[in-house]
């Protein structure tokens, strides 16, 4: 058996799929834990909204830089090595944030988290694509579902510690960060043992470097659109329900809960849909569901109908990202993934701020028409996506 065949067999194994699933879950748990800690961190350090925005911007800029470096290194030396090297940055970032007593230290923690998350995001998607190719059946939606589950667990740890330890406000930041860091360290130890080697992806022909394919920029445009649409659902759904339905903030949280739940559900089902209908069709219908959902929340004001609208949004946007990232990885490995993920990440990072400006201009109800239009654009662009289903079983 050749070395290439041996590597393919290792990537096709159940243990390889478990390893990548754990990567996504660990990354989601750290990001969810950090996001869940922000209100408490604000109380602990006495931060205002501008300082929070600065910290998040620094972390986001670090992530975008790490994506470019991590994507190229993943192709050059293997996505396994980059993924495992990124986790310590996440751990260090969580500990730094947890122990921070001044704003400057919190920024350092945010930058460490950004560096780790950016490199890991590209690399774990790259090795996920290789596992999918080796198994010859879709599995990327499943991986992304466990990122969402990990994020939910990380954010839910805030409530768990509050109940078990009776901690509130700034007092919860340090134990939360240390607990998340320990969980990530345990995950890293397991990943070191079970993660198989990933293939090296060359980008030269006869010694000449090949250009980034044109399709990468089309996928990047789609990532911009779904990044803003998904970011809006994550950051604005609860506020939208609260303001439009005229309910209290606790009830308004149904918006985000509904979006998150339906994203997980569709991602657990998504691979079966890809096997049956193909990625282009799944992306089209995902964008259609999301567009109808956003149109619904733009037109209605009753609580039940708003929940239905946000359910459609979650159901729709949950289909799109795993498929776009999978296509990017199949056509160009980590280098193309770095381009596409950067577009999506930038939109996810900056989109909610843009929506905030729009809300101030036209109101939160009518502002939701913008992501509806972007989702309509994804429907049009889906027909230009490269077909990568040929090597996957159609069942």
Q: What kind of feature is each model-predicted range?
A:
Residues 119-134, 318-331:
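Intracellular juxtamembrane helix-capping segments at the cytosolic ends
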Residues 331-366, 371:
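A late C-terminal transmembrane helix in Major Facilitator Superfamily
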Residues 172-190, 366-384:
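Symmetry-related core transmembrane helices of the 12-TM Major Facilitator Superfamily/SLC fold
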Residues 66-78, 162, 266-279, 359-360:
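Helix-to-loop junctions at the C-terminal end of transmembrane segments
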Residues 277-324:
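C-terminal transmembrane helical hairpin of 12-TM major facilitator-type secondary transporters
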Residues 46, 78, 99-104, 246, ...:
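Helix-breaking motifs and short loop linkers at transmembrane-helix boundaries and internal kinks
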Residues 36-50, 235-251:
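Short amphipathic helix-loop junctions that connect adjacent transmembrane helices
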Residues 80-83, 283:
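Primarily marks hydrophobic transmembrane alpha-helices of the MFS/SLC 12-helix fold
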């Amino acid at each position: 058996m050749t070395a290439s065949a041996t590597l393919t067999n290792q990537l096709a194994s159940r243990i390889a799929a478990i390893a990548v699933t754990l990567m996504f879950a660990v990354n989601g748990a750290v990001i969810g834990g950090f996001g869940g800690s922000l209100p408490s961190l604000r109380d602990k350090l006495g931060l205002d909204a501008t300082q929070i925005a600065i910290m998040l911007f620094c972390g986001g800029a670090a992530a975008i830089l790490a994506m470019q470096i991590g994507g190229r290194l993943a192709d050059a030396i293997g996505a396994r090595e980059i993924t495992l090297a990124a986790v310590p940055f996440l751990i260090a970032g969580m500990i730094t944030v947890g122990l921070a007593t001044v704003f400057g230290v919190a920024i350092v923690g945010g930058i460490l988290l950004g560096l780790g998350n950016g490199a890991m995001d590209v690399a774990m998607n790259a090795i996920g694509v290789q596992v999918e190719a080796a198994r010859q059946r879709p599995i990327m939606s499943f991986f992304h579902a466990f990122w969402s589950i990990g994020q939910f667990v990380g954010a839910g740890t805030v409530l768990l510690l509050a109940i078990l330890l009776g901690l509130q406000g700034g007092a919860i930041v340090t134990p939360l960060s240390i607990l998340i860091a320990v969980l990530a360290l345990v995950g890293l130890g397991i990943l070191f043992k079970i993660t198989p080697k990933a293939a090296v992806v060359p980008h030269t022909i006869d010694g000449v470097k090949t250009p980034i394919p044109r399709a990468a920029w089309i996928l990047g445009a789609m990532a911009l659109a779904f990044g803003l649409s998904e970011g809006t659902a994550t950051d604005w759904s609860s506020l939208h329900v609260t303001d439009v339905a005229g309910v209290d903030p606790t009830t308004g949280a149904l918006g985000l809960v509904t979006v998150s739940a339906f994203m997980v559900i569709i991602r657990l089902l998504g691979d079966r849909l890809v096997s049956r209908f193909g990625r282009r069709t799944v992306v089209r219908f995902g964008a259609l569901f999301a567009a109808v959902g956003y149109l619904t929340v733009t037109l209605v004001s009753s609580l039940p109908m708003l929940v239905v609208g946000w359910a459609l949004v979650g159901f729709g946007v949950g289909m799109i990202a795993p498929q776009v990232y999978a296509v990017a990885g199949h056509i160009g490995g980590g280098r193309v993934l770095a381009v596409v993920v950067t577009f999506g990440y930038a939109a996810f990072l900056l989109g909610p701020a843009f929506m905030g400006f729009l809300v101030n201009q036209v109101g939160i109800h009518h502002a939701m028409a913008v992501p509806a239009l972007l989702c309509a654009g994804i429907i049009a662009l889906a027909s230009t996506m490269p077909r990568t289903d040929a090597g996957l079983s159609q069942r």
